Amino acid sequence: PMPSVNIQLFGEDENGIGEIVARGPNVMMGYLNQPEETAEVLKDGWFYTGDLGRFDAHGNLYITGRKKNVIVMKNGKNIFPEEIEEKISRLPYAAECLVFAREKHNDLVLWTKIVYPEDYLKEKNWTVDQLAEQVRMDLGAINDAMPKYKHINHFILSHEPMIKTTTQKIKRIPEIEKINAQQDSELWYNCTM
């Protein structure tokens, strides 16, 4: 951190991940004319950022996600969707991706929606089913590198852009609501055959 700025983690879990809090002369004093919102994020001189992170052995801070995006599985394990999305976004056909949970047989299972560029299929001379097979293999490799509770079980393919803010960030809640309102589609797949 900068001189005279303190950064700590609040409410750390067993993996050392907690909410990033900061205080110092250059940290915000509050929201203008919004005392309730200010009281939610400023406590005892600390600014609660809403970001989650962890420190490594050298004191470097790593941001792992947003507190409001955490998925709490039925077994109590926390999943930070941004961690998995970062891996999926490296795939050459993943223009956009979103990880979310849906209820299935009294449990939560992870899904991802992947938006692929429309011309990707033309460039590869593939059908959507051929892309789905590639996605299934790639998600299998991603799953193999993660604990079982973080495994993606299902995926959705689309070439339609997701709902975004003016700064081009995916609006998670409206996009998930849109997905949940849709009936199963031929473009919804299981990760295993």
Predicted regions and their residues:
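Short coil-to-beta-strand transition motifs
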Residues: P1-S4, F47
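AMP-binding/adenylate-forming catalytic core of the ANL superfamily
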Residues: G11, G24, M29-G30, L52-M146
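Conserved C-terminal "lid"/linker of ANL adenylate-forming enzymes
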Residues: L98, G140-M193
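Short secondary-structure edge/capping micro-motifs at helix/strand boundaries
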Residues: E37-T38
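Ser/Thr-glycine-rich phosphate-binding loops at phosphate-binding pockets of nucleotides
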Residues: T49, K74, T165-T167
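Glycine-centered tight turns that cap/initiate beta-strands
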Residues: S4, Y93-E96, H151
